[in-house]
Amino acid sequence: MFLWYNSFQTKFEIDTYLELSNNMSLCMGCMQEIGDNKICPSCGFDTTEKQQAPFLPYGTILQNRYIVGAGIDTNGESTRYISHDKQTGDIVIICEFLPIGLFSREEGTTEVRINYENRLVYNKLKDDFLNYYRILSELRELSALMNVHNIFEIQTGETGEKACESG
């Protein structure tokens, strides 16, 4: 499953040590239940650490559905985060459009500020990014491609896919 998020809202619910209903706490590194542990027994993630700018803070909730965890890779155009889908319980990947050098984000915030002199380039690249994932969404039946299920805008461009378990 691949998700996309991008809109012009700037406020999200944030909690770095996320506790869900029914007393379940999630590790922001692997999205497994960790109870009261500060270090995840599954992946070793330290729940007391904060995600560094310009990445989304741990526990950011998008669309009142997706809980954003640790950034797992970045490529100059976008950053992928491990995430939890509160609706299905699935581990998903959220991909956020974050083109290096064209924006800024203060640590601990979700608001992205587009550099004024780069706004046209930023918007063109964002449109290209969104169109790419819309095409992938239409081709979701092809097993060789990532399965894009949800594309939405909050402020920057993001997408998500269902995480595959190894083993």
Model features per residue range: what roles?
Residues C27-C30, C40-C43:
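Short cysteine-rich clusters marking metal-coordination/redox-active sites
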Residues A70, R134-E138:
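Conserved alphaC helix of the protein kinase catalytic domain
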Residues E49-V68:
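A short, low-complexity linker immediately N-terminal to eukaryotic Hanks-type protein kinase catalytic domains
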Residues D73, R140-A144:
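Flexible N-lobe loop architecture of eukaryotic-like protein kinase catalytic domains
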Residues E33-G35, T47:
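Cys/His-rich microdomains that often coordinate metals
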Residues F55, T79, S83-I135:
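ATP-binding glycine-rich loop module of kinase domains
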Residues V68-G76:
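Protein kinase glycine-rich loop
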Residues N147-E158:
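Short beta-strand micro-motifs within the conserved protein kinase catalytic domain, predominantly
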